[in-house]
């Protein structure tokens, strides 16, 4: 999921007869990807959590900064949709705006965040790149309660770079 910054490299890196798919909310991005990255099958998705793949279809799914643009309801809807299309024992990698992003929160938001509540700032259309969600560990662990959390990676911020958390889960 996302604008192909990562998936465009996978056919060359992995090169073992795998099939690669990409999906995104942005129609122009998908059109560009279809024209310029023929090794990957792309489709446009809507904001609603519905993908055109059968149950238990993918071995690996990744979403780089996808949940960071969704409401609490769509966190649940999209996680459930990704879980649906992930094969048993499949692995999902998702990035979130965790503790590194607490500095961006107001005092009332920080209090709620520290209580394990998702914080959403949405003065723009949901799904837009400036619609922002901040995901505390407790919220994410509850979201992934039907899966095994293999790892939760938090990296320290660097000058001019604030890394997102990486969650690696297994169905």
Where are the language model's segments positioned?
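Class I (Rossmann-like) S-adenosyl-L-methionine-dependent methyltransferase catalytic domain
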Residues: 2-50, 72, 76-77, 93-171
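Short glycine-rich loop/turn motifs that provide flexible caps or phosphate-binding loops at active sites
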Residues: 21, 64, 89
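A short acidic, Gly/Pro-enriched loop at the edge of an enzyme's catalytic core
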Residues: 51-61
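A short SAM/SAH-binding and catalytic strip from SAM-dependent methyltransferases
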Residues: 59-73
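A short glycine-rich, Lys/Arg-flanked "PGG" loop and its adjoining helix->strand segment in the class I
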Residues: 76-88
């Amino acid at each position: 999921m996302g604008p192909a910054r990562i998936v465009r490299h996978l056919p060359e890196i992995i090169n073992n007869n795998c099939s690669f798919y990409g999906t995104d909310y942005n129609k122009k991005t998908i059109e560009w990807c279809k024209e310029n990255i023929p090794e990957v099958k792309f489709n446009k998705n809507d904001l609603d959590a519905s993908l055109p793949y059968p149950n238990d279809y993918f071995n690996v799914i990744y979403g780089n900064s996808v949940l960071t643009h969704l409401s609490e309801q769509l966190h649940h809807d999209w996680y459930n949709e990704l879980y649906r299309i992930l094969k048993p024992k499949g692995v999902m990698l998702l990035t979130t705006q965790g503790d590194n992003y607490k500095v961006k929160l107001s005092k009332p938001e920080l209090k709620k965040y520290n209580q394990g509540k998702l914080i959403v700032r949405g003065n723009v259309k949901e799904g837009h790149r400036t619609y922002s969600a901040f995901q505390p560990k407790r919220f994410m662990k509850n979201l992934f309660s039907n899966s095994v959390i293999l790892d939760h990676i938090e990296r320290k911020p660097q000058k001019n770079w604030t890394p997102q958390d990486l969650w690696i889960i297994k169905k």
